[in-house]
Amino acid sequence: MPTIQQLIRTERSRLKAKTKSPALKSCPERRGVCTRVYTSTPKKPNSALRKVARVRLTSGFEVTAYIGGVGHNLQEHSVVLIRGGRVKDLPGVRYHIIRGTLDTAGVKDRRQSRSKYGAKAPKE
């Protein structure tokens, strides 16, 4: 516990907030190249084969990013755009791949929440 004199001499230092997505380097999105596309199993109590990709970013980081939606066209050397946002049941996955940009196709036959999956409006 500091004395009042010590506090006058040097004020208390504020705690710096730690970023949840350091690989983005304060940018909303980052471009990267897929180095590996694979499936991963979630933590208990969930069970599935979640689609993820290892991505080397322009910021120099290599991160694991989640591929949302039903089906995807990604393979090694695909150029993708990633955003922040973790997947709660996949440890170490703190980024999402943005569908419908660069080499990532949008989700086919998607009718609801289309903007989140890069799907065009259905033909009427």
From Swiss-Prot:
Gene Ontology cellular-component annotations: small ribosomal subunit
UniProt-listed GO biological process terms: translation
Modified residues (3-methylthioaspartic acid): D89
Pfam families: Ribosom_S12_S23 (PF00164)
Superkingdom of origin: Bacteria
Region Disordered, annotated ranges: 104-124
Entry keywords, A to Z: Methylation, Ribonucleoprotein, Ribosomal protein, RNA-binding, rRNA-binding, tRNA-binding
UniProt GO molecular function: rRNA binding; structural constituent of ribosome; tRNA binding
Job of this protein: With S4 and S5 plays an important role in translational accuracy.
Family: Belongs to the universal ribosomal protein uS12 family.
Subunit structure of this chain's protein: Part of the 30S ribosomal subunit. Contacts proteins S8 and S17. May interact with IF1 in the 30S initiation complex.
Protein name: Small ribosomal subunit protein uS12
Source taxonomy: Bacteria, Bacillati, Cyanobacteriota, Cyanophyceae, Synechococcales
